[in-house]
UniProtKB/Swiss-Prot annotation:
Its cofactor is Mn(2+). It catalyses: (2R)-2-phosphoglycerate = (2R)-3-phosphoglycerate. PANTHER family: 2,3-BISPHOSPHOGLYCERATE-INDEPENDENT PHOSPHOGLYCERATE MUTASE. It comes from Mycoplasma pneumoniae (strain ATCC 29342 / M129 / Subtype 1). Mn(2+) 1 binds at D397, H401, H456. This is 2,3-bisphosphoglycerate-independent phosphoglycerate mutase. GO terms for biological process: glucose catabolic process; glycolytic process; positive regulation of fibrinolysis. HAMAP family: GpmI. InterPro entries: Alkaline_phosphatase_core_sf (IPR017850), BPG-indep_PGM_N (IPR011258), Metalloenzyme (IPR006124), PGAM_B_sf (IPR036646), Pgm_bpd_ind (IPR005995). Belongs to the BPG-independent phosphoglycerate mutase family. The active site is at S61 (phosphoserine intermediate). Its EC number is 5.4.2.12.
Length: 508
């Protein structure tokens, strides 16, 4: 019988032996529990060197889907940039040097925009420090910094700023122009009202201002506002002409991960990706640079252009003239398409893409079920048409990021109902379910001091197959082993570029 496969990726669903604050453990999820207990299952590495990140670095959705789709370890933004800084190549990068030179030639400013974080998921503070060391001796610099509070603890910006302000004392050419939370400046669900507030601050206009960056963040903490939700504020110590974005300025967006940088990039530098124009208009003749390639954005230049990843999982399916479906809600749609396909936007032969709209709520603890039922409804209507379906459920990650433990438990329990529907449908229709995750999150929601945890983890993730005629090797394995395993299961030849091994063991 011709085999059909569903690969279900539970975003942020890690496994931990620690029970305290573990929403995965405490949620009533009989369907998921049964899959892991009763079927072939192996625990996969989803962080650090096993997925192309520095040792001990937490995994993330972008890297996770890249490795799953590539069938090999993919060295991405963080490791690549770190290595360039270490070798000194960073300081000779021609794109960075051109951004500096253009600002000097135009008697203009160089703006650095990005996430102020050591989380290493979207950006890293070390890269900001390196950029300042490179450019500050040569040109006036303005920093527009977004607080994190998701990929690190909710209130880390103050201590990070304290150290940063000491560093800046040696660089008199550098000022912090604006501060704000990623909730405003790094949305990815077209909530343009939020982006407008952050963008207007970059233009020099906000109802909030600061004279002391550290004190401004502390005042937010006093009002129970964490880094993520810091209201965009402008520097009140200087005239706005000293920090506001102007015509002919240079801009470096130092996030290396694209999904939460695209919308602000569109506000700054017109693209064809979105049908939206900022109310205040755009500045002219910007030299706009992105650290990595941002899907759908065509900047003036890219500091580290993408390296091609040939023969991805999706390409192998297409080359074999098989039909495939990619399905997720808005929040994770790019992950099962762009990232899964090696960091490129591509429409493969016999491929269908389905995006289910994410719910319009301020934070997902307000609707922890998210769009999991809508995704499942769409899935069950279409899946029989396809040989391979790749699905993402966002609940464990997106609700996990809110730090709301009770809501995360609710989200997992709502998700489990849909998982049971999928299991039943797959059994009735002879579809093999492979279930995994891209990284951990929901299994660590409360720390030992009973503080909420909002960031990803370094825990392993499950990889389950519902075909009991096979088994899975229990040796050390990672996300990169998933594609080779499913290709072997489908009887398809693994391409040479896909260097990870299949974990498949046949019992027959």
């Amino acid at each position: 019988m011709h085999k059909k496969v569903l690969l279900a990726i539970l975003d942020g669903y890690g496994i931990s032996n620690k029970q305290h604050g573990n929403a995965v453990y405490h949620a009533k999820t009989p369907a998921l529990d049964s899959l892991i207990k009763d079927y072939p299952c192996v625990m996969l590495e989803a962080s650090g060197e096993a997925v192309g990140l520095p040792q001990g670095q937490i995994g993330n959705s972008e890297v996770g889907h890249l490795n799953i789709g590539a069938g090999r370890i993919v060295y991405t933004g963080l490791s690549l940039i770190n290595q360039n800084i270490k070798t000194g190549a960073f300081h000779h990068n021609q794109v960075l040097l051109e951004a500096i030179a253009r600002a000097k030639a135009n008697n203009a400013k160089l703006h650095l925009i990005g996430l102020f974080s050591h989380g290493g998921v979207h950006s890293h503070m070390d890269h900001l420090y390196a950029l300042i060391k490179l450019a500050a001796p040569q040109v006036k610099m303005v920093l527009h910094l977004f607080g994190d509070g998701r990929d690190v603890a909710p209130c880390t910006m103050k201590s990070d700023l304290e150290a940063f302000m000491v560093f800046l004392k040696d660089y008199h050419n550098v000022i912090i122009g604006t501060l704000g939370g990623r909730y405003y400046g790094m949305d990815r669900d077209q909530r343009w009202d939020r982006e407008e507030i952050a963008y207007n601050a970059i233009l020099g206009n906000s109802k909030a201002s600061f004279t002391d960056p550290v004190a401004y963040v502390q005042s937010a903490y006093d009002q129970k506002v964490t880094d993520e939700f810091l209201y965009p504020a402008v520097n009140g110590n200087v005239d706005k002409e000293q920090f506001a974005l102007k015509d002919h300025d240079s801009v470096i967006f130092f996030n290396f991960r694209p999904d939460r940088a695209r919308q602000m990039s569109h506000m700054l530098f017109q693209t064809d990706y979105y049908d939206y124009t900022p109310k205040a208009g755009r500045k002219y003749n910007l030299f706009f640079v992105t650290m990595m390639n941002y899907e759908g954005i065509k900047p003036s230049a890219v500091v580290f252009p993408p390296e091609t990843i040939p023969n991805t999982f999706g390409e192998v399916i297409a080359h074999n003239k098989l039909k495939q479906l990619r399905i997720a809600e808005t929040e994770k749609y790019a992950h099962v398409t762009f990232f899964f396909d090696g960091g490129v936007e591509v429409d493969l032969p016999n491929e269908t893409k389905c995006m289910v709209p994410s719910l319009k709520v301020a934070t997902y603890d307000l609707a922890p079920e998210m769009a999991c039922k809508g995704i499942t409804d769409q899935l069950l209507n279409q899946i029989n048409q396809f040989d391979l379906t790749v699905l993402n459920f966002a609940n464990p990650d997106m609700v996990g990021h809110t730090g709301n433990y009770a809501a995360c438990v609710q989200g997992l329990e709502a998700l489990d109902v849909q998982i049971q529907r999928i299991i039943d449908f797959c059994k009735a229709n002879h579809i093999t379910l492979f279930l995994t995750a891209d990284h951990g999150n929901a299994e660590e929601m409360i720390d030992s001091n009973n503080n909420p945890v909002t960031k990803h983890t370094v825990n392993k993730v499950p990889f389950v197959c519902t075909d009991t005629n096979i088994d899975l090797q229990q040796d050390s394995a990672s996300l990169a082993n998933i594609a080779p395993t499913i290709l072997a299961y489908l009887g398809l030849k693994q391409p040479a570029e896909m260097t990870a091994n299949s974990l498949l063991i046949s019992k027959k």
